[in-house]
UniProtKB/Swiss-Prot annotation:
Species in which this protein is naturally found: Arabidopsis thaliana (Mouse-ear cress)
UniProt protein name: Transcription factor SCREAM2
Primary location class: nucleus
Annotated bHLH domain residues: 263-312
Signal peptide: none
Disruption phenotype: The ice1-2 scrm2-1 double mutant lacks stomata so that the epidermis only contains pavement cells.
Length: 450
């Protein structure tokens, strides 16, 4: 439907509105829907019709349609009949027609202010009416008090204007146009209650929600960045020496920092690894010391170590009881805490017991030398022990030119030397076995015994 229009009166056309937008309001008497022509005394009034072929007389029919969309508060105004008009009503209608002309002249401006879309199904949206004025439409069973004795209009007129529930009387168009400034409000993003939101409102709501999400994400990213930079500044102010940290201090720090935000998780991880390694090493050491270990887990190792310590304490208590029960005159027992002299004597006695083996002091020294293949010899020597005997014996063999390749030497309960193979290094002369035996006896302190 074309939204552009112009009023035509008896004298001629009115000037163009909005820079030459052509009007399409033309009189077409052949397409009148109603068979009731206007009275002869009102021929000078303006007539108009829509492009769809619906002629209306503003003095009778348009007033009837527009009165149903206005909530009138004046109950004292007389009810106008569509076909019986007096002089007062004619004068009032002429004033209304002038206001209608001024309203339709500013139609394009109102449309631009309201941002009404061009594609709609409501006929009067082209005039800039809100959805609140045109939300309700006529129905077949609804009849307003203003349409009395004119049933043909309700059945043939299309649904242009709503029928308010509280319309009880007739009023002029001046309240409608005077309240028009109050109706012109900025377009809200959210739809009003009871009506579906338009496509523009949905898109505006989506843009607003997306912008709010972007603002929230930017603010959260800035907060994370600032917290990260603050942590870096805190950690960069001091030098951390990880190698100098011990396990006790790490445990103390972890206990004190409970419930607080950890700045360096790597430091705590390294400290925990060192603590566990030290604990495992000590458990292995304890397991090697304790003789009886039932299982290899930590609980078993600790339990067996505790049992072993209890056993040692019991043995110590038994020894104390035995010492207290024996008389002090007994010379067979040593004191509980021996002196260094007695301790060294006991060590020597344990190393060289006098009664376990016969002493070589009562025996003659023995030296045996046997020749083997080539220039190799086999030497067996046994004598009493004295300080420096091993060193003097090895020097004597070296002076004789013998290279000892395999030998066994024992200083337990005497001096015993078994040389399994010794070769002569000097090629010009050979050393005889008797000569080797005499040199070894002389070294042992038994010169002349051959």
């Amino acid at each position: 439907m074309n939204s552009d229009g112009v009023w035509l009166d008896g004298s001629g056309e009115s000037p163009e509105v909005n820079n030459g937008e052509a009007a399409s309001w033309v009189r077409n008497p052949d397409e009148d829907w109603f068979n009731n022509p206007p009275p002869p005394q009102h021929t000078n009034q303006n007539d108009f019709r829509f492009n769809g072929g619906f002629p209306l007389n503003p003095s009778e029919n348009l007033l009837l349609l527009l009165q149903q969309s206005i909530d009138s508060s004046s109950s004292s105004s007389p009810l106008l009949h569509p076909f019986t008009l007096d002089a007062a009503s004619q004068q009032q209608q002429q004033q209304q027609q002038q206001q209608e002309q001024s309203f339709l002249a500013t139609k394009a401006c109102i449309v631009s202010l309201l941002n009404v879309p061009t594609i709609n199904n409501n006929t009067f949206d082209d005039f800039g009416f809100d959805s609140g004025f045109l939300g309700q439409q006529f129905h077949g069973n609804h009849q307003s008090p203003n349409s009395m004795n004119f049933t043909g209009l309700n059945h043939s007129v299309p649904d242009f204007l709503p029928a308010p529930e509280n319309s009880s009387g007739s009023c002029g168009l001046s309240p409608l146009f005077s309240n028009r400034a109050k109706v012109l409000k900025p377009l809200q993003v959210m739809a009003s209650s009871g009506s579906q939101p338009t496509l523009f409102q949905k898109r505006a709501a989506m843009r607003q929600s997306s912008s709010s999400k972007m603002c929230n994400s930017e603010s959260s990213s800035e907060m994370r960045k600032s917290s990260y930079e603050r942590e870096i500044d805190d950690t960069s102010t001091g030098i951390i020496d990880i190698s100098g940290l011990n396990y006790e201090s790490d445990d103390h720090n972890t206990n004190n920092n409970k419930g607080k935000k950890k700045g360096m998780p790597a430091k705590n991880l390294m400290a925990e690894r060192r603590r566990r390694k030290k604990l495992n090493d000590r458990l292995y050491m304890l397991r090697s010391v304790v003789p009886k270990i039932s299982k290899m887990d930590r609980a078993s190792i600790l339990g067996d170590a505790i049992d072993y310590l209890k056993e040692l304490l019991q043995r110590i208590n038994d020894l104390h009881t035995e010492l207290e029960s024996t008389p002090p005159s007994s010379s067979s027992l040593h004191p509980l805490t021996p002196t260094p002299q007695t301790l060294s004597y006991r060590v020597k006695e344990e190393l060289c017991p006098s009664s376990s083996l016969p002493s070589p002091k009562g025996q003659q020294p023995r030296v045996e030398v046997r020749l083997r293949e080539g220039k190799a010899v086999n030497i067996h020597m046994f004598c009493g022990r004295r300080p420096g005997l091993l060193l003097s014996t090895m020097r004597a063999l070296d002076n004789l030119g013998l290279d000892v390749q395999q030998a066994v030497i024992s200083c337990f309960n005497g001096f015993a030397l078994d040389v399994f193979r010794a070769e002569q290094c000097q090629e010009d002369h050979d050393v005889l076995p008797e000569q080797i035996k005499a040199v070894l006896l002389d070294t042992a302190g038994y010169a002349g015994l051959v």
